[in-house]
C-alpha cells in the first residue's frame, strides 16, 4: 500500500467502556461507555468543531461495534451518521475475551512486563496481526478525502502505522489512549489532547 497520496486522517479511539474500567479484554465483544467515556467523546467532538472539522469538511467512518458507534454519534453531535465499516472493528482476542491481564498471566505465564502486543499475539483463537494489517491497509487504500475514523486501540495503532508508511515493527512507538485525537497527514503524526485544541 502506498501512503504517499493518503488524505488527511483523524483517528479516534472509542471512549472508556465498563470493561476498560474493569481491565477486561473486549476484542470483538462490546460493553457500554462509562460516564467518563461519554464525556471523552463529547470533548473530542468539541475539539473537532473548534478545528473546523465537520461532516461538511470530512467523511466520518466508524467501526460497527457499539462502543465505537456510540462514540462516533457523540463526536458528530448529530450532524450526520458515520459510515460503518467492518474493517475498523477491533482485533479479536479469541478465548481471552472478557478476562483480565492478570487472569491471562496466570493461565499462560506471560511476564508482567511483556508488551501489550505480546498478549494479542498469544491469544488463543485470536485474529492474527496479518489479518488486521490487511483490513487496515484495504480501508486506507479506499479513502478519497479527509476523514475522521472512530475505531479501537489496536486497530488505531495499525491504521496510523500504515498511514505513516512505517513497518509494523514500529507500531508500539505510537501513543494510544482514550480522549485524544490522532492526526496523520503527509506521513506525520500528532496527538491532539483537550489542552492543545
Protein language model features and the residues they cover:
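Generic beta-sheet signal
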Residues: 9, 58, 142-154
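Short, well-ordered beta-to-alpha junction loops that form the rim of enzyme active sites
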Residues: 15, 62-65, 87, 150-154, ...
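Generic structural signal for well-ordered alpha-helical scaffold segments
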Residues: 42-49, 133, 137-144
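Active-site signature of alpha/beta-hydrolase-fold catalytic machinery across serine-
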Residues: 74, 158-162
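Phosphate-handling substructures
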Residues: 75-135, 173, 193-195
Amino acid at each position: 500500500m502506498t501512503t504517499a497520496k493518503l488524505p488527511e486522517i483523524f483517528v479516534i479511539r472509542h471512549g472508556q467502556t465498563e470493561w476498560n474500567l474493569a481491565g477486561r479484554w473486549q476484542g470483538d465483544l462490546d460493553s457500554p461507555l462509562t460516564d467518563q467515556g461519554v464525556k471523552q467523546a463529547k470533548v473530542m467532538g468539541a475539539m473537532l468543531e473548534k478545528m473546523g472539522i465537520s461532516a461538511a469538511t470530512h467523511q466520518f467512518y466508524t467501526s460497527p461495534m457499539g462502543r465505537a458507534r456510540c462514540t462516533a454519534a457523540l463526536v458528530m453531535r448529530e450532524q450526520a451518521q458515520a459510515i460503518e465499516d467492518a474493517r475498523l472493528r477491533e482485533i479479536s482476542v479469541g478465548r481471552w475475551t472478557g478476562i483480565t491481564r492478570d487472569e491471562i498471566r496466570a493461565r499462560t505465564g506471560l511476564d508482567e512486563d511483556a508488551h501489550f502486543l505480546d498478549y494479542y499475539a498469544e491469544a488463543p483463537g485470536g485474529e492474527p496481526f496479518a489479518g488486521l494489517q490487511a483490513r487496515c491497509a484495504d480501508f486506507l487504500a479506499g479513502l478519497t478525502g479527509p476523514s475522521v475514523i472512530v475505531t479501537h486501540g489496536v486497530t488505531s495503532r495499525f491504521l496510523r502505522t500504515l498511514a505513516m508508511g512505517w513497518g509494523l515493527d514500529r507500531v508500539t512507538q505510537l501513543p494510544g489512549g482514550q480522549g485524544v485525537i490522532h492526526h496523520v497527514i503527509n506521513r506525520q503524526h500528532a496527538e491532539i489532547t483537550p489542552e492543545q485544541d
